């Protein structure tokens, strides 16, 4: 199966190729950025498909904890060392961390050069590689330093997932479930009826294509996250705080989003937007892939105060992304603090169910 989707916004128009990685031809210098693990698995395969006058490789450490300014400076140092100019190209070969960093580095190098995404994790393929959001972390939180910089193209090769560990695969499934809960009830039902598996490339590729199509439609309508695109942050408002509190060492991003979705669902239930049956159905689907659905909150008020650093918050009003049934979502900045604290307090117990 091979499919090409398109992102078309006011500032960009680029293809998303879903299928076996084609040959990539470029007339100028190329800097490919990856990490040791991904490079060991896929670098040779990818380099054989790049046709360019000069191709250089930059290897950065693996892990969310390295998505910082130090790594960006190293990528830029590689670019300067190899004399990349404004017509040069960067390629991100890896998961969401690599994609975020290369997107950011290419966006600020000489005021911006082209880059291409070749995502190698399910999470990056269905979400992080599409849409042009880039960023790095700092001590205050996740992705607080960044910019919108759309790639020149995205190449999604589902066969690269054959080497993906089970836990990484599950983290990506969380983002697929997110898309279904927010925008497509029929897709959610399909995910309930069938099992996503690396061993079933046909259904997996269809699920990837469906998720990317949803993301593309949202980005085309709202490139800079001024409206509906904020709905894609379902699970992330809570999840980013969990990642920060655990210093990006306890949960994969998709796992933190899974917990965040459950917290958002609990808040939706409290506000009467979601039934208990719907909440339980979402949790059950997440748990099918061994995704966490609970996080022990030691201090609900301390957790609440961290919402003030969320990028969606404006004028000290916290924007929550809350499901209204399955297939619909609401952006709310009027949720009473007491209701949020009640939900957070419920996660201070042994079970969030």
Swiss-Prot record:
**Top class in the EC scheme:** lyase
Q: What is its main location?
A: cytoplasm
A Gene Ontology biological process in which this protein takes part is: amino acid biosynthetic process
Q: Which reaction does it catalyse?
A: 7-phospho-2-dehydro-3-deoxy-D-arabino-heptonate = 3-dehydroquinate + phosphate
Question: Does the entry annotate any disulfide bonds, and if so which pairs?
Answer: none
Locate the residues binding Zn(2+).
175, 236, 253
Entry binding sites for NAD(+): 62-67, 96-100, 120-121, 133, 142
What does the entry list under GO cellular component? cytoplasm
Q: Which keywords does UniProt give here?
A: Amino-acid biosynthesis, Aromatic amino acid biosynthesis, Cobalt, Cytoplasm, Lyase, Metal-binding, NAD, Nucleotide-binding, Zinc
- InterPro entries noted in UniProt: Dehydroquinate_synthase, DHQ_synth_AroB, DHQ_synth_fam, DHQS/DOIS_N, DHQS_C
Q: Which cofactor does it need?
A: NAD(+); Co(2+); Zn(2+)
> What are the EC numbers?
4.2.3.4
Task: Please state the pathway this protein functions in, per its UniProt record.
Answer: Metabolic intermediate biosynthesis; chorismate biosynthesis; chorismate from D-erythrose 4-phosphate and phosphoenolpyruvate: step 2/7
What compartments host this protein? Answer: Cytoplasm
- Pfam families xrefs: DHQ_synthase (PF01761), DHQS_C (PF24621)
Provide the GO MF annotations for this entry.
3-dehydroquinate synthase activity; metal ion binding; nucleotide binding
Q: Does the keyword NAD apply?
A: yes
Q: How is the cofactor bound?
A: Binds 1 divalent metal cation per subunit. Can use either Co(2+) or Zn(2+).
NCBIfam families under this entry?
aroB (TIGR01357)
Give the UniProt family note: Belongs to the sugar phosphate cyclases superfamily. Dehydroquinate synthase family.
Q: What does this protein do?
A: Catalyzes the conversion of 3-deoxy-D-arabino-heptulosonate 7-phosphate (DAHP) to dehydroquinate (DHQ).
| Protein name (record) | 3-dehydroquinate synthase
The source organism is: Helicobacter hepaticus (strain ATCC 51449 / 3B1)
* UniProt lineage: Bacteria, Pseudomonadati, Campylobacterota, Epsilonproteobacteria, Campylobacterales
Gene it is expressed from: aroB
């Amino acid at each position: 199966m091979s499919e090409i989707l398109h992102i078309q916004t006011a500032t960009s128009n680029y293809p998303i190729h879903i299928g076996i990685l084609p040959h990539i031809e470029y007339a100028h210098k190329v800097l490919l950025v990856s990490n040791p693990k991904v490079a060991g698995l896929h670098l040779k395969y990818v380099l054989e498909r790049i046709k360019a006058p000069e191709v250089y490789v930059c290897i950065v450490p693996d892990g969310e904890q390295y998505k910082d300014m130090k790594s960006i400076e190293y990528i830029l140092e590689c670019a300067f060392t190899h004399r990349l100019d404004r017509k040069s190209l960067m390629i991100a070969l890896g998961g969401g961390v690599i994609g975020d960093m290369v997107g950011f580095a290419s966006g600020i190098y000489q005021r911006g050069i082209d880059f291409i995404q070749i995502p190698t994790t399910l999470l990056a393929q269905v979400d992080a590689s599409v849409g042009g959001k880039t960023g790095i972390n700092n001590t205050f939180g996740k992705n607080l330093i960044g910019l919108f910089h759309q790639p020149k193209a995205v190449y999604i090769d589902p066969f690269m997932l054959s080497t993906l560990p089970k836990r990484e695969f599950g983290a990506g499934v969380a983002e697929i479930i997110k898309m279904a809960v927010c925008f497509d009830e029929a897709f959610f039902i399909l995910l309930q009826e069938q099992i996503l598996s690396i061993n079933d490339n046909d259904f997996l590729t269809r699920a990837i294509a469906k998720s990317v199509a949803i993301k593309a439609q949202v980005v085309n309508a709202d490139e800079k996250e001024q409206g509906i695109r904020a709905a894609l942050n379902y699970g992330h408002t809570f999840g980013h705080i969990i990642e920060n509190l655990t210093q990006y060492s306890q949960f994969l991003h998709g796992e933190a989003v899974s917990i965040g979705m459950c917290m958002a669902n609990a808040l939706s239930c409290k506000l009467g937007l979601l039934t208990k049956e719907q909440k339980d159905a979402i949790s059950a689907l997440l748990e099918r892939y061994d995704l966490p659905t609970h996080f022990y909150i030691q201090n609900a008020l301390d957790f609440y105060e961290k919402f003030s650093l969320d990028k969606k918050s404006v004028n000290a009003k916290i924007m929550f992304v809350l499901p209204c049934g399955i297939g619909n979502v609401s952006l709310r900045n009027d949720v009473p603090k007491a209701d949020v604290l009640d939900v957070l307090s419920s996660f201070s117990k042994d079970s969030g169910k």
